[in-house]
């Protein structure tokens, strides 16, 4: 009964395959959107149930010898508790003898449907009456012994040994290639080295439901801990470890929560410490934090209604809004004492600050919201939610910056009015601004030359940027990954396969699956594909079954049945136990109806066939054809052009793999980010031009963001940074946030050109520095995330905002000074920005 390849029962290992679930933000709503790849992930998990298995490895330490008993005891106990918990459809650590015999009956009693061309002659020989007599005589002396009940039962189920023929070409049940079914008490899922025993369970709900997955894994871990607490179990040294899709789901949810807590805490604490250093009075500090605090609170309230639940990327809005919260209110705090110093009352100073700075604040919030709103148009759902929530947050902060904070300032000053203008300004920042601007005043041409040189050099190297091909959500030290690696090492059960998902009526699905299997077989023979698991090894199409049966059309099965009866009597056997097989031979001799899915389900164990092909609620069928590449890191195991040609030849199907889904997701994010970049750039250009009504002024206002974006990518290239798809997503944010520097500085300069750009830069500089520092801290907190794309966005945005600050505080004054120096006798005509 030996064989090699991928026999039907080896598809039991297919139900074991781990399918890492796509990131979910709720039990029913995919983060990725509605593209075919992502619909396929949902269909595989929900309708087909494919990959929704929980594995539990029962292992013993290396060097232990007699541990079979404790392993079986632990596996039996946990399996029994699973079945009574109400959380699992079925759970098993082996096959019952009757299940094994039913598999034999399924293939032996329907042998015309499974006999291939290369097996036809051997089967005909076994059906020959003379050969039947010889086989029965041999069975009487070799197969049936007082110590071989399985041999006896096997002989009763398949007295002609037809299953042995099918097994030679990978159609037998004996080769559970990953298990040693003969070790221990028998029929158990032991590893080949006998050091591990596997429990395979199918929970009631999909692994893509994070809440249910957490419940299942928590239940499993609790029961394992209770077993570990017992002295007898603890002394045995047996180790029990859950693995598979449900463990990945649980770990990813914990991963999300851990990352959000970490980056939010870093952003909030970092900005709080920064504000404590900068603001001289506690009430002023509290007022500066008010827009961020209320903005986060109100935005969270909106998000609770829509989208209802958020994902890892969109949850980062807490850290980002904590950094953006005081970006505009600091300009009020900076402007009010300056206006008060000109004379008049404090209330007059506040009103003048509103009249001058208020419009700039409004413009800056609108430009930032333009960038986030452009991301909200993304077809990639996670990015769209991120953009939407940030846009809501920006408008919430605008409301509190323009209305709530001034109102509270008025109330505060009724009880504690400042005695001098300088008591409500900043610490340290005016000194830093003066030093920077004085340097620009002394070396304007040097600053411009350095900025232009850096810009040009970065621009030259931009075409060499390459995006990373993939990213991993979890690392090798993650418990889910470690458990999956042990599962692979012990049982050869790999990670996520490539899957062709086929839908339609039953025979259409099976026919297409056979054609695709034949196409994949060529790649397996060339060594590109390691293994193929097709539903048609368990259930061939009716057409294939008829073709195979036709090759046996000349065999007189009625004569074979008579010969079997006679030989049984001649050798002293009772015919009653074998009568079902004899009757089946006679029926097959009269007619051979094709095997159906319902027939297969009656004979095969739960989880064997229904995870390969299943009837869905609307009466159609869904089948999963899975295969593994020889190179585990290969993404295009089968070229896209070949898959497209197969679709034209064989009909529609969905190609699915988490590696491909990863790549498609990155391509989608890149596409959406480029579109958001175009919309943001167009919106910002329009807003800036409508605000200043002068092309030359508009170009000067744009200096910080152009320098910031190009310089960021140039510097990262210089240090050989590996870019990911989220680098492009950061560009609209740099544009929307970095433009604030140019708007505030140039508008202030236009109001008081007679003071000169250096004086204006010194007056505006402290607010520019403070607003950018809090933003850098907010986005910089994302770099603490262990989710690589989020950390990438934090790095690129933080560096971009820092360079945009340099462009605003250094380059804009330097450019204006250089222009003034070129026309000292006609400054009004050359530098008049009106």
Annotate each predicted stretch with a short phrase:
Residues 148-282, 586-684:
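Extracytoplasmic
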